[in-house]
Amino acid sequence: MSKIRILVGVKRTLDYMLKPRINATKTAVDLSGQKMSINPFCDIAVEEAIRMKETLKNRIEDTLVVTAGQTSSEPILRQCLAKGIGRAALINVGEKELEPLSVAKLLKATVEKEKSNLVLLGKQAIDDDAHQTGGMLAAMLGWPQFTSASKVRIEGDKVIVTREIDGGEETLSSTLPAIITTDLRLNVPRFANLAKVMKARKAPLGKMSPEDLGVTIDQRLQTVSVSEPVQKRQNIMVKSVDEMVKTLKELGAL
């Protein structure tokens, strides 16, 4: 049986408990002063990598978590280290806007550099819901891809993944190397204790740039506008039945 080198891709997003607000120019979500966290789907991927490390033990040669962004993304990397990931690295892209294709290119170069043979990714990010990075990375590497995994098993060099589909479940298998994108049903991420959090604050982080990886970042898409969902329900208070009937007629409901 071959050794397993796991790479987990993660993304920094607006905390899922917060309601997004649109900036003044209506071209993006305003992140100024907002709490940022690890994308929940990425957190599932991190947890699964740690569980593999715990259960497969000597077979896991390396666990590496990678994110592409600015130095402001370092806290989520340290969070992953505190939970049990072995190493963490930041691909510093500065102020550049990243599209899924650029992220896939950066991950491909990192996979090849680190000789990873199992990649875990969240199936989507809650900010753009693109669902694209995993598929693009699989195509670039020529690896099999398991999407929206709700159960994962590794038996020898075989990866067995169950995913939920309409009205049931589908189980697929392939051999390493492979890419898995994770669904929220796969596991429940752990919390790191204070001692591990403090230790992770002092842990070294790998630093790379797109140039180090031989990747050129091109922006092919331009955001034209961003808007909040249209309010479909109106709350109208009435004082009597007659007023209610009148209001319903005015709205065309009667």
Curated annotation (Swiss-Prot):
It is found in: Mitochondrion matrix. The electron transfer flavoprotein serves as a specific electron acceptor for several dehydrogenases, including five acyl-CoA dehydrogenases, glutaryl-CoA and sarcosine dehydrogenase. It transfers the electrons to the main mitochondrial respiratory chain via ETF-ubiquinone oxidoreductase (ETF dehydrogenase). GO terms for cellular component: mitochondrial matrix; mitochondrion. This is Probable electron transfer flavoprotein subunit beta. Signal peptide: none annotated. It comes from Schizosaccharomyces pombe (strain 972 / ATCC 24843) (Fission yeast). It holds the Pfam family ETF. It comes from the Eukaryota. GO terms for biological process: fatty acid beta-oxidation using acyl-CoA dehydrogenase. InterPro entries: ET-Flavoprotein_bsu_CS (IPR000049), ETF_a/b_N (IPR014730), ETF_b (IPR012255), ETF_beta_N (IPR033948), Rossmann-like_a/b/a_fold (IPR014729). GO terms for molecular function: electron transfer activity. Heterodimer of an alpha and a beta subunit. PROSITE patterns: ETF_BETA. Its cofactor is FAD; AMP. Binds 1 FAD per dimer. Belongs to the ETF beta-subunit/FixA family.
